[in-house]
Amino acid sequence: MQSQTDVWRSRVSSSLGIVLGAAVAAAAVAWTGTAEAQTKTLKMQSTWPASLTLQDNFKFFGERVEKLTGGTLKIETMAAGQIVPPFEILDATSKKVIDGGHGISYYWVGKNKAATLFSNSPAGIVGMDQMDFLGWIYEAGGLEMWWDFYQKDLKLNVVAFPILPSSPQALGWFRKPIQSVEDFKGMKCRQTGIVGEIYKKMGMNTVNMPGGEIVPSAERGVIDCAEWVGGVEDLRLGLPQVWKYHYTPGMHENASIGELIINKEVWDGLTPQQQEAIRSATTETLVRWWVKWQKQNADAIEEMQTKHGTQILRTPPEILTEFLKAWDEIAKEEMAVNPIFKRIYESQKAYASKVVPAKRFMFPPYSFAANYYFPPQSR
């Protein structure tokens, strides 16, 4: 029996340049003569407010599935709260209250902290970027470990696929300038999952909440600072309306990937062609959003500065270094008591130990040519 990664490899090239062509080809050949086929509709819900591009990512996926299947499979892409609260979509999918969901696995760290290793992966686990992390998923058994984590470790009736690139992310939004970790002390900040624990080690008081609650909480004085995503997502959520100082980058989500989850019985009930369409659509959506965000984020930064007077500042290196140290401590502590976390972390570290040093040697620093053609200006 083929592994999930082997199945994926047989359909989608590891070259991102070929992925889009493969998806287009699938649309042309995967479904023929389907006019008479019965249409199936899957009801899925995200964890995102309807106004965000995160939800647009979900809708784009649904549109691609419908086209790739010639209209025989449709996805109803509902926003957060339309059926269940945002943080309940995993259990709702497993219990078949909904057929699937669109979110990010670090929301499920309450079930097991290893959930963070399939999504935001603080510090890229050990220095990986988003491409490296996807390499682990597609080429080093990560997808199988993801499915096993949900099905065997958490006893949930779901399958999962990477679909949403959401990094690198900004450090966050603040009411006043910050210079060092000392400035975190006494601040109450919106952070999620294991990242919240890391910032607690650094002196913050942290609270978890869905994105839609951030602005109202800030306006009521419940929180002093917040992290969401950065760029266009923060702009759409309205964060420049309540905070003036925006620091970037962060080190907490520099290899972050959102997920599509589907009830396993629903997945098994799809035809091979419908499953293929979902695989192709998730991969195409991932790549298209990766490149789309580049321009959207650049435009958003400009709008924050010109229309909202946002002070966009580089994060002091000391803060990033202290984050890495705190993350290493928490990862070590968790591995000592959580064999599931240890198994996944060590797999990622083994992959990174080969890829990250080689990539550092082969790739020129992004700033090398960027600074030559576009000399940096102080913000």
Q: Where are each of the predicted segments found?
A:
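Sec/Tat signal peptide C-region and signal peptidase I cleavage site
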Residues: 29-37
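A short, highly charged nucleic-acid-interacting micro-segment common to nuclease
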Residues: 136
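N-terminal secretory/targeting leader peptides
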Residues: 21-22, 38-133, 149-379
